[in-house]
Every structure is written in structure tokens, then in C-alpha cells.
């Protein structure tokens, strides 16, 4: 990635985002200037770099690995991963299962698909079992 050829100026930021107030524009300018400095630093040879990114990265890794865990023994990142994984499962279950508010007529009106040519016996058995399960609900 090449660093941008033009530096961000407060006037350019203000022109690009006229709806921003002056404090937000100043903050954005500071962030863009810092970003430009980092890009320029990465473009320089390793021994001439001004910032110590490896040290900062290791410090952040240590800080995140020493995050506070709850009483369950799972760290924040493990809990977040689990929640993220389970949210898909939960949404699939919620979408594909009838609820108390679903009228009985709607759930019985859905007809199961017929097995297509080339399907295996195992798949047909699974569908038949699924039909029986849905019929008993």
C-alpha cells in the first residue's frame, strides 16, 4: 500500500465533510495526520522507523489475554466467540420452528418437499422422520 501523495489539511477535511463541527473536523484531521505518519513510517526501512509497533502489538496481546473473565471461567473473547457461533444456531432454530404465536393452520399448511431423483435412502428416511416430528408438534 502506497502512502497518499497529498497530506490531509484541515481545509480539505472541512470541505469533504461540511456537516462536521470544528471539533470533529479537528479530531478527524489529527487521526488522518497520524495515519499518514504511520504509512510513511512503514514505507521507511525497518531500522529507521520512529515507532515501535512490535512492542505495542505485544503489549496489546498481553492486555487482551489478561482480560477479565467472569465467574464461568471463560474469557471475554471466548464468550464473544461462543455467542457469535450460537447466535446463528439460535436464529436458525427460531426461524424454522413453530412458536406459540404461530397459528396451527399455518404450520400444517407447509407441505414437505418430495425427495428428488438421485437422493439416497438415508435422505428419504431423514425427511420422513422430519415429517413425523413436525406432524406431532
Curated annotation (Swiss-Prot):
Positions with biased composition (Polar residues): 96-110
Disordered: annotated segments: 57-111
Tissue specificity here reads: Detected in kidney, heart, brain, lung, skin, spleen and thymus.
One of the protein's GO biological processes: negative regulation of cell population proliferation
Low complexity: bias regions: 65-82
Q: What positions are modified (Phosphoserine)?
A: 67, 69, 71, 75, 91, 97
Q: Which residues are annotated with the PTM Phosphothreonine? A: 111
Q: Which Pfam families match?
A: RGCC (PF15151)
Cite a single GO MF annotation: protein kinase binding
Main localization category: cytoplasm
The recorded induction information for this protein reads: Up-regulated in oligodendrocytes in response to complement activation.
Q: How is this protein annotated for GO cellular component?
A: centrosome; cytoplasm; nucleus
Its keywords, alphabetically, are: Cell cycle, Cytoplasm, Cytoskeleton, Nucleus, Phosphoprotein
Q: Which InterPro entries match?
A: RGCC
Q: Where in the cell is it found?
A: Cytoplasm; Nucleus; Cytoplasm, Cytoskeleton, Microtubule organizing center, Centrosome
Protein purpose: Modulates the activity of cell cycle-specific kinases. Enhances CDK1 activity. May contribute to the regulation of the cell cycle. Fibrogenic factor contributing to the pathogenesis of renal fibrosis through fibroblast activation.
Report quaternary structure and partners. Answer: Interacts with PLK1. Interacts with CDK1. Interacts with SMAD3.
Task: Indicate what this protein is called per its UniProt record.
Answer: Regulator of cell cycle RGCC
